[in-house]
From Swiss-Prot:
Keywords from the named record: Cytoplasm, DNA-binding, Metal-binding, Nucleus, Transcription, Transcription regulation, Zinc
InterPro entries: Carb_Metab_Trans_Reg, Transcription_factor_dom_fun, Zn2-C6_fun-type_DNA-bd_sf, Zn2Cys6_DnaBD
Protein known as: Uncharacterized transcriptional regulatory protein C25B8.11
DNA-binding region ranges: 25-54
GO terms for biological process, alphabetical: DNA-templated transcription; regulation of transcription by RNA polymerase II
GO MF: DNA-binding transcription factor activity, RNA polymerase II-specific; RNA polymerase II cis-regulatory region sequence-specific DNA binding; zinc ion binding
Length: 654
């Protein structure tokens, strides 16, 4: 045990044991944990269990009280103490910080403030989105609950949990809303008598597990730094904040960018890997990227999936954010794996209290904003994957009380397109409608009930059509990211209602004209997507919609094949739709892959009894590629051992 105690300096003396309450050891202080020393001369319990040196008996380092800052943003330049990290002292990572220096008080444009150049000598622009050196990444205000890089497990004490919250509230002494006992810390964030909320921060005492976690984190960082150089990393971060973040703002952009500026290892490895993976989608379509992609995106997503499976055992805020990036960009290859990630992310968010209304909590406003955005992003994923997988939802109406996000609710120093942000808000509104549709029409009990009463379901569908039309947005006057995808998602809900009406053969929905108007509008919105749209933000559920639309077009053609008018219209729409899918696929728009494979298999099977469908299939696929349908076959993905990064054989960028 003696090797765990640091020897005091020659000019210092040991601190008296009675000073423990006012000055814990450095490790306990950083972890905000109670420093317990059973006897003088021994290390504290936490350092003993973690097998790390204890500084309790060293002379305390003199602390200079800093001036109060304005809610994480100051007009002063950050001091060296607030910006220095282990990576800053490493020359390998210092270069990145030097090249990302911001012009104080100004927004860095894509053509200034960067000295990094790519392999071909082209300058790599950096869009810091309004971030300057005034922003303090080490400001402790944002992460008082240990949701990010802390070694604590924060979770909400629910009213029925084994911890007696009434006993704790009435008989324990809280100082500034915090009470520490038995190496655990309980923190009040809401003292409301109706819905009090307490967090418990339980130190991570699993020594071997923590060692594995640290080893994995360093290994993944080493892998990323090996295959993604400084200029490429800057480009990928730029692509993410240019193409994804405006319509999907789940990251604290200012804090992330300045953390990345101070060294890529300041960003949790799983979040950085997920962000790089998302950004690779836009590598071919953005003029700021050059050459071949530095990594294979599908292999990167496999790594992220393996990493999430590990990080879920020691979750942080970055774990949820990485999972959300996985859920919006991961190409569908395994429904079970994706459903598992979604379910665990949902439960984890509830464990950390994201389903509560944090408006009156005693936490920084920035954290309130991020919490709301993350919860609604999880809500969106839960509803849409539930719809297309045909599974029960993980989130029910009574499970959350999170208010909607206001259109002017932004973070300090955050600069984003208001139109793109509104597409995110409108998607939340549409997903709320989808929740009611799934709950009222598609639960097991609802399906049983409606099979006996068609009139009831007819009234409900009419009501849902009315609500859908009332929230459908008018045309945006200015172009914005996510607009095309938002139109597709509205079409998807409308088609879902029509398919339900057809399934129950409801008398109020027998007009073929109205049905074809809906389908033609969906195909028209799809055809408006061009090869240049590959740089736009699309929700991943668009791929399911395209596949569903193919099936519906074939069904309509067969249902009306004796009708020269409707049968011919459906056949013409099917022909145009599949050909446009192939055109987009050749331009790198991979959301149509599922629809192409679905159309090929359906036309082949149904062509046995309907030769004209087989002729259509042969004409479409053989005329576009000499390999025929084999050109669109799914390529099996390679699996990797996350503990052996050297086996991940990615080609380095030239």
């Amino acid at each position: 045990m003696s090797n765990l105690i640091l020897t005091p300096s020659n000019n210092g003396t040991e601190r008296p044991y009675r000073s423990r309450k006012t000055r814990p050891c450095d490790n306990c202080r950083l972890r905000k944990s109670r420093c317990v020393v059973e006897s003088i001369g021994n290390p504290c319990l936490l350092c003993t269990q973690l097998k790390i040196p204890c500084t309790y008996h060293l002379p305390p380092i003199k602390r200079n009280k800093q001036k109060k800052q304005q809610d994480s943003v100051s007009d002063d330049t950050p001091s060296e103490a607030t910006t220095t990290t282990n990576d800053d002292r490493d020359p390998k990572y210092n270069a990145l910080g030097n090249n990302l220096d911001a012009v104080r008080g100004k927004v860095i444009s894509p053509t200034q403030g960067s000295d990094a150049r790519g392999p071909d000598g082209r300058q790599v622009p950096l869009n810091l989105a309004g971030i300057t050196e005034m922003y303090h990444t080490s400001d402790d205000k944002f992460d008082k609950l240990g949701l990010d890089d802390s070694l604590n497990y924060p979770y909400v004490l629910g009213p029925t949990c084994d911890s007696d919250i009434d006993l704790i509230r009435e008989y324990f002494s809280f100082e500034n809303g915090v009470c520490s006992f038995d190496n655990m810390t309980v923190k009040y964030v809401s003292t409301s008598s109706k819905s009090p909320v307490m967090y418990i921060l339980d130190p991570a005492y699993e020594n071997d597990r923590h060692s594995d976690f640290s080893r994995y984190d360093h290994a993944l960082h080493d892998l990323l730094s090996t295959y993604i150089d400084e200029a490429t990393g800057r480009t990928l971060v730029n692509l993410y904040f240019s193409h994804v973040h405006p319509s999907y703002p789940i990251l604290h952009g200012p804090r992330f960018l300045l953390s990345y500026k101070n060294g890529s290892r300041n960003v949790p490895s799983i979040l950085l890997a997920a962000l790089y993976s998302v950004a690779l989608t836009y590598w071919p379509s953005d003029s700021r990227s050059f050459g071949a992609p530095p990594l294979d995106q599908r292999k990167m997503w496999t790594i992220v999936e393996e990493g999430l499976n590990f990080h879920f055992t020691q979750p942080r805020l970055s774990t949820i954010q990485a999972a959300l990036l996985y859920l919006i960009s991961r190409p569908l290859h395994n429904m079970y794996s994706l459903s598992s990630i979604l379910s665990r992310t949902t439960v984890l968010s509830q464990l950390l209290g994201f389903n509560h209304d944090c408006t009156e909590w005693k936490i920084p406003n920035e954290e309130k904003t991020i919490r709301k955005r993350i919860w609604w992003a999880i809500f969106i994923a839960d509803k849409w994957y539930s719809m297309y997988f045909g599974l029960a939802t993980n989130i029910h109406e009574d499970d959350f009380v999170v208010p909607k996000i206001e259109s002017d609710e932004s973070l300090p120093l955050e600069i984003t397109s208001s139109h793109s942000f509104k597409t995110f808000l409108k998607m939340i509104e549409l997903s709320s409608l989808l929740q009611d549709i799934l709950q009222d029409l598609f639960t097991v009990r609802a399906l049983t009930r409606h099979s006996k009463n068609n009139r009831s379901i007819s009234y409900q569908i009419i009501g849902f059509f009315t609500r859908l039309n009332s929230i459908r947005p008018v045309e945006f006057t200015e172009p914005a990211l996510g607009v095309a995808s938002l139109k597709i998602q509205f079409d998807a809900v409308e088609i879902l209602l029509w398919k339900t009406a057809l399934r129950f053969n409801l008398p109020d929905f027998q007009s073929a004209d109205d049905l074809f108007v809906c389908v033609e509008k969906s195909v028209s919105n799809f055809v408006q997507i061009t090869a240049n749209s590959s740089g736009d933000f699309f929700w991943p559920y668009a791929g399911f919609h395209f596949s569903t639309l193919v099936s519906l077009l074939i069904r309509l053609h067969l249902d009306f094949h004796t009708n020269n008018t409707y049968g011919a219209r459906a056949f013409s729409l099917l022909d145009a739709f599949v050909r446009h899918c192939i055109t987009l696929h050749e331009a790198g728009f991979d959301f149509v892959e599922m629809a192409i494979r679905r159309s090929s298999s359906l036309l082949k099977e149904l062509g046995k009894d309907h030769p004209h469908l087989l002729a259509l299939r042969d004409d479409i696929f053989n005329s576009n590629d000499s390999r025929g349908e084999e050109a669109y076959n799914h390529v099996p993905e390679q699996l990797f051992d996350p503990w052996n990064p050297h086996s991940w054989t990615f080609p380095k960028s030239d």
